[in-house]
Every structure is written in structure tokens, then in C-alpha cells.
Amino acid sequence: MPTLAQRATALLNVHPSHQFRRDRWFQIRYDLGYAAAGLAVLALVATGVVSPLFGAPAGWWLAAFPVALYVAIAAHLLVHNAGHGSFPRPWNRLAGELCGVLIAVRFVGWTLIHVRHHKYSDDRVDDPHPNFPSFLRTAIHSMLQVERQLMKAYYVQWGDTPENRAREQMRARVSYATTLLLFAAWGALLGPWFFVAVFLPAQLGAALFVIHFNWVTHNGHVGKDFAPVDQDTGWFWLGNRLFAGIYMHATHHERPYLFHPLFRNTPPRADAARDVLTAKSA
């Protein structure tokens, strides 16, 4: 019988995409665990065991916003890299989970969506975030596609049956509720004013940044020839230095194991030679 420590170690060394392929109930159990954690945080704050970090608005919050925005964008980047197994084990799972909670979308959902982006890149039906000449249309389409694409991923793995469709409808409701609970937990921890004035705008700004980066690195701003491209001039040059080569997207699609695509000739680590998303190995 494995000990609690052994179970924790095993969990930290497995990638969530592997758990998804082994257990048809995995996503629901996973989200229910985070929902319970969110409820626990809310209870701790409500009972006074934990106090909110910030109170009334203060002038220094203006300086805090760009820091919060940078952290939120970096969290998206690190969840992405953990999805590709770019960190050494067991830190890879830990980084993915922590950063996934920071942006409330969670590691598993982020990863499963990104699997489909690599597999169906620029396919208007199956890419979760295909690009259009209009950035606004691209942004709205991307935000509305998340649950639909998660359902498609499930049907590909487990079959498109009435039973599985009912299960996915339930999972989607659990997912929405869990996201709301995590945001509520952040609001309780940070305090309502800081949550509304700094945290939420930073989350929205980071989401739009990620959508925009994908748009310009698939020629969305050009309006034709939608495909991954590398960008490293002007503001893109700065973005690559601030966010680990984020705009070198063609290189990333070619060598997804790279933590920093600017350094394209970096050999993969022995434990990262497989790419867990594009299924180059198990």
C-alpha cells in the first residue's frame, strides 16, 4: 500500500494529459478538488482565521498593476511550458498547477486546449483559437470556444456517445463553478477592492495579451497565410526578452520542448526529450 508521500510523489511526476487518457472521470474529480480548495479558502476568510491581504484603495496600487499584469502573463507562459514538460520533474507538475491556479483556468484545462492548438493549428473548426483578420473577432471566438473544444477532446479520447455527452455537460457545469469559486477565493484573500481594481484587470489584460500574441504569430494582423511565424522586431523583440521568446512561435511549433525558443539549438533534457502534448513519445 503506497504511503501518502509516495502518492504525492507519483502525482507530481505524472503529466495531466496522461491522467486524462487513463480516467474518463479525471477532469471532474480534478475540478472538484479545486472547488473544495476554493470553498475552504472562503470559509477561512469568512470565519476570520485568515484576513484579506489588502484593505482600502491606496495610491501604490497604480504601481502594483503593471507588476500584477506581468505576473499574470508570465503565469500563462509557465503553464504553457509546463504543458510541454519543459521543467524538470517533479517541478513541472508543481509549476503548472501553481500558475494555473494563479490565472484560475487550471493546468489540466489549459493543457488539453493547447494539445488541440498544436494538432489542429489554424483549422477554423478544431483549433481552439484560430485567427481572423479582425482581432476582436479572434478574441471573442477564442473565449467562446474553450468548453466546446474541451468537449471535443473528450469525445476524441472516450467516444462521442449520449452517455459521454451527458458527462461532458456535467463537467462543463463543474468547470464553470470551479472557476467562479477560485476567483471568489482570490477576491476573499486579496480583499474586494484590490481584487476589482488590480487583480481582475490584470487577468483580463493577460488573457488579451495571450490572444493577441497568438494572433500576430499566426499572421492574423496580416489577414492571410495563417500559420505559425517568428516575430523578433520592434515591440516583439522586447516581448521576446520579457517573456522567454514568446513571439518565436514558428520555432515553438517546430521544437515545442524548448523553454526559450530564442535559443533554438538548445538540446532537450533527457527527461523532456518526449513532448507530452504532441505525443512524440509517451
Where are these regions (language model features)?
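Conserved protein kinase catalytic core
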Residues: 86, 224, 258
